[in-house]
Amino acid sequence: MEQLKAFDNEVNAFLDNMFGPRDSRVRGWFLLDSYLPTFILTITYLLSIWLGNKYMKNRPALSLRGILTLYNLAITLLSAYMLVELILSSWEGGYNLQCQNLDSAGEGDVRVAKVLWWYYFSKLVEFLDTIFFVLRKKTNQITFLHVYHHASMFNIWWCVLNWIPCGQSFFGPTLNSFIHILMYSYYGLSVFPSMHKYLWWKKYLTQAQLVQFVLTITHTLSAVVKPCGFPFGCLIFQSSYMMTLVILFLNFYIQTYRKKPVKKELQEKEVKNGFPKAHLIVANGMTDKKAQ
């Protein structure tokens, strides 16, 4: 126990030396004073994916329809609360859309910080997205993009809450909360097979996410062009991180929605040229059993 405490002190001292003094307004808030809980929860998340897949390997997939319905509804409602509260609190604080520093809005800044804590905490709750994929044996959904996005967001927002918990930080979560209302509504509806025919708009969610990232980068860099006292290093780091998401999500979009029609056309031509469907190879390397 003493060794763990010593390690915790060393990690926190290292972070304080790297980023400077923490924002005193968030001292004592749940999970924020020490990085260790966030780090341990992230490692637990990654181990759960690996061990969960091994555990489920020879077991039937679980349905979880009822749990998923409640979960998606809860995340949708939380996202709606954060969206409304961020709009109201930033309006109350008289936030400047181009650049907003950390300490000019008084109680408005504290109100924004409280909502952003819920945003940070929601990233922990969203680890369940992956756990549900594991239990339902949807391993094709557990991509590098999925895991990287979930794990990194939780850790980055721990840093944001400790050093830049308001001001310019409000914009990305405002957009993301709106996107998550759409996303988790979609996920909730997709649990029911009878609703699948109405869910043709999935690819537009990815497009909306890409637009969200570009707008967030633009908003972040606007504070570089016309500074207002918000930490310059944080602006550059946030822009760089968002660029990694743009690259990964754009690659996902191209692989999922741009290359599939080409493959489909090729398969149709092969059938027309006299090749039976049983000889076609599908994406996972298995033959189309329905055609055999």
Swiss-Prot record:
Keyword Ion transport part of the UniProt annotation = no
Q: Where is this motif: Di-lysine motif?
A: 289-292
Q: Quick one: a GO biological-process term for this protein?
A: fatty acid derivative biosynthetic process
Instruction: Give the way it sits in the membrane.
Output: Multi-pass membrane protein
Q: Which InterPro entries did the record assign? A: ELO_CS (IPR030457), ELO_fam (IPR002076), ELOVL2 (IPR033680)
Summarize subunit and interaction data from the UniProt record for this chain: Interacts with TECR.
Molecular function GO labels = acyltransferase activity, transferring groups other than amino-acyl groups; fatty acid elongase activity
The domain-related comment in the record is:
The C-terminal di-lysine motif may confer endoplasmic reticulum localization.
**EC number(s) from the headed UniProt entry:** 2.3.1.199
User: What keyword terms does UniProt attach to this protein?
Assistant: Endoplasmic reticulum, Fatty acid biosynthesis, Fatty acid metabolism, Lipid biosynthesis, Lipid metabolism, Membrane, Transferase, Transmembrane, Transmembrane helix
Originating gene:
Elovl2
Reactions this protein catalyses? a very-long-chain acyl-CoA + malonyl-CoA + H(+) = a very-long-chain 3-oxoacyl-CoA + CO2 + CoA; (5Z,8Z,11Z,14Z)-eicosatetraenoyl-CoA + malonyl-CoA + H(+) = (7Z,10Z,13Z,16Z)-3-oxodocosatetraenoyl-CoA + CO2 + CoA; (7Z,10Z,13Z,16Z)-docosatetraenoyl-CoA + malonyl-CoA + H(+) = (9Z,12Z,15Z,18Z)-3-oxotetracosatetraenoyl-CoA + CO2 + CoA; (5Z,8Z,11Z,14Z,17Z)-eicosapentaenoyl-CoA + malonyl-CoA + H(+) = 3-oxo-(7Z,10Z,13Z,16Z,19Z)-docosapentaenoyl-CoA + CO2 + CoA
| Protein's name according to its UniProt entry | Very long chain fatty acid elongase 2
Q: Which family does it belong to?
A: Belongs to the ELO family. ELOVL2 subfamily.
